[in-house]
């Protein structure tokens, strides 16, 4: 199994990937370094594939990985509906890619980071 170590221990790397994947689900795009984006792309494709299945086991696997954060708050008169990142993944993102087999994300290269010259990219959902 090959993966990028990203200069971190395994627990730190897993936490980083969980955070970046959750941010991508909530915001639709993130700005990060190129190696991180390439790793997040793998996990995001896995999460969308699980969401497309839509069964209980897939939902539980995704819930074990995606952070429990608020993705959207909708007000409808007196009712306030709070949507989590997991609900956003299963209800909004997965139906959008129902007829697509992989390749759910796009990497756009931007200018290098000013401080250390690291290659920066924008990772977004297609």
UniProtKB/Swiss-Prot annotation:
Transmembrane regions: none
GO biological process, one term: translation
GO cellular component: cytosolic large ribosomal subunit
Pfam family membership, one: Ribosomal_L17
Keywords of this entry: Ribonucleoprotein, Ribosomal protein
InterPro entries: Ribosomal_bL17, Ribosomal_bL17_CS, Ribosomal_bL17_sf
GO MF annotation: an example: structural constituent of ribosome
Heme recorded as keyword: no
PROSITE patterns tied to this protein: RIBOSOMAL_L17
Keyword Protein transport among record annotations: no
Homology family: Belongs to the bacterial ribosomal protein bL17 family.
NCBIfam families given in the database record: L17
PANTHER family: LARGE RIBOSOMAL SUBUNIT PROTEIN BL17M (PTHR14413:SF16), RIBOSOMAL PROTEIN L17 (PTHR14413)
Quaternary assembly: Part of the 50S ribosomal subunit. Contacts protein L32.
Protein name: Large ribosomal subunit protein bL17
Organism the protein comes from: Limosilactobacillus fermentum (strain NBRC 3956 / LMG 18251) (Lactobacillus fermentum)
């Amino acid at each position: 199994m090959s993966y990028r170590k990203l200069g971190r221990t395994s627990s730190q790397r897993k936490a980083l990937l969980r955070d970046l994947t959750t941010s991508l689900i909530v915001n639709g795009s993130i700005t990060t370094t190129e190696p991180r984006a390439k790793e997040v792309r793998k996990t995001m494709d896995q999460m969308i594939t699980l969401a497309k299945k839509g069964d209980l086991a897939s939902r539980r696997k995704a819930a074990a990985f995606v952070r429990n954060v608020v993705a959207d708050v909708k007000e409808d008169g007196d009712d306030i509906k709070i949507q989590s990142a997991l609900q956003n993944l299963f209800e909004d993102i997965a139906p959008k890619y129902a007829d697509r087999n992989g390749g759910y994300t796009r990497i756009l290269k931007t200018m290098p980071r000013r401080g250390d010259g690291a290659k920066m990219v924008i990772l977004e959902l297609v």
